[in-house]
């Protein structure tokens, strides 16, 4: 009797364990499938290469913010405003940060269409010319007679005529040569160009490459109303998936906030995905970028865009002759998707 009872007990225990294990495996599998189905695969381009200033996207990925928002994000190095515009409007990427002024130049000249900004990234333009001590450039006027390098698609290069006009530079006396995000700093360090198009936050990275003190000529000294980068998507994607756009934006801005709050940690996360990263230079870039992202004094929330200020930016570009009359903020920005205070 005892043996029969023991046998029944063992069989029941084994069966229960088997059912429990099966149920557990099924649950894990179902959860995995559910998560897999809920994650939309999207491609995100960085603004320009994989420098510290773009670490916030990798932070959002590493911390699971994108996954929590329903996205499986493939982050690829961007090639500047013009290139990013082409790739996003062609449907080869869903999101990318680009300089708002570059977007206005493209839209106002009729070079591109089918895109829309859905969030701000930086509240002031970070466009600049960076040179090195000893190159004979300490003021904008010194750029005359010099050779500068930048990508043809870069907003720094494309906005230069307006900057030159306001800074009293004869743009016809400045020579430009082509470069890529990956080669520009090496070109400057090797003395193959007197200056390069960069963002102001690139100063520490330039110095780490060139082993010399960098001199920065910020465009914002003369163009104070211009925004920096904004988050771009295609008009079609924004129209068809407004809730997804808002979810992605929220996740990205969360990564941006974390990166500004803790640059050192963000730099280490960037290095995990981009092994060639110099963590010290990357963290320094993020530290410099902080005031451009959010001004505590103004109380403007991260991601905000103001239509009146964008209109003033358009007026500046029209006044310098770089874009034709007729462009409005609503043609390039979907304010219904822009984060509110």
Predicted regions and their residues:
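Ligand-binding "clamshell"
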Residues: 40, 106-118, 206-219, 281-283
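Secondary-structure end/capping motifs
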Residues: 240-320
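Conserved C-terminal helix/tail region of periplasmic/extracytoplasmic solute-binding proteins
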Residues: 310-341
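Bacterial N-terminal signal peptides that target proteins for export
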Residues: 1-12
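Short, glycine-/small- and polar/acidic-enriched structural segments
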Residues: 33-170, 175-178, 185, 194-200, ...
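Bacterial signal peptide processing site
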Residues: 26-29
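Pocket-lining segment of extracytoplasmic ligand-binding domains
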Residues: 101, 182-274
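C-terminal motif of bacterial Sec signal peptides marking the signal peptidase cleavage site
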Residues: 20-24
């Amino acid at each position: 009797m005892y043996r029969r009872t023991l046998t029944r007990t063992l069989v029941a225990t084994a069966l229960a364990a088997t059912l429990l294990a099966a149920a557990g495996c099924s649950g894990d599998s179902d959860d995995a499938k559910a998560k897999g189905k809920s994650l939309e695969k999207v491609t995100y381009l960085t603004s320009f290469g994989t420098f510290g200033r773009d670490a916030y996207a990798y932070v959002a990925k590493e911390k699971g913010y994108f996954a929590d928002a329903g996205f499986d994000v493939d982050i690829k190095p961007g090639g500047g405003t013009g290139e990013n515009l082409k790739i996003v409007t062609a449907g080869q990427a869903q999101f990318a940060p680009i300089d708002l002024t570059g977007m206005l130049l493209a839209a106002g000249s009729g070079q591109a269409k089918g895109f829309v900004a859905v969030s701000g990234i930086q509240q002031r333009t970070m466009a600049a010319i960076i040179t090195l001590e000893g190159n004979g450039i300490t003021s904008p006027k010194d750029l005359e007679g010099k050779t500068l390098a930048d990508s043809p698609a870069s907003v720094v290069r494309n906005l230069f005529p307006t900057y030159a006009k306001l800074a009293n530079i004869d743009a016809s006396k400045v020579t430009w040569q082509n470069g890529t995000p990956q080669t520009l700093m090496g070109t400057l360090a090797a003395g193959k160009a007197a200056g390069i198009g960069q963002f102001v936050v690139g100063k520490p990275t330039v110095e780490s490459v060139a082993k010399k003190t960098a001199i920065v000529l910020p465009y914002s000294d003369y163009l104070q109303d211009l925004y920096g980068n904004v988050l771009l998507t295609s008009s079609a994607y924004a129209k068809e998936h407004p809730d997804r756009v808002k979810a992605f934006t929220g996740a990205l801005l969360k990564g941006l906030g974390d990166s500004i709050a803790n640059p050192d940690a963000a730099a280490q996360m960037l290095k995990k995905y981009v092994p060639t990263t110099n963590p010290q230079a990357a963290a320094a870039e993020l530290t410099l970028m902080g005031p451009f992202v959010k001004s505590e004094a103004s109380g403007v929330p991260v991601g905000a865009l103001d239509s009146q200020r964008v209109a003033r930016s358009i007026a500046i570009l029209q006044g310098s002759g770089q874009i034709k009359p007729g462009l409005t903020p609503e043609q390039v920005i979907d304010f219904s998707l822009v984060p509110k205070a």
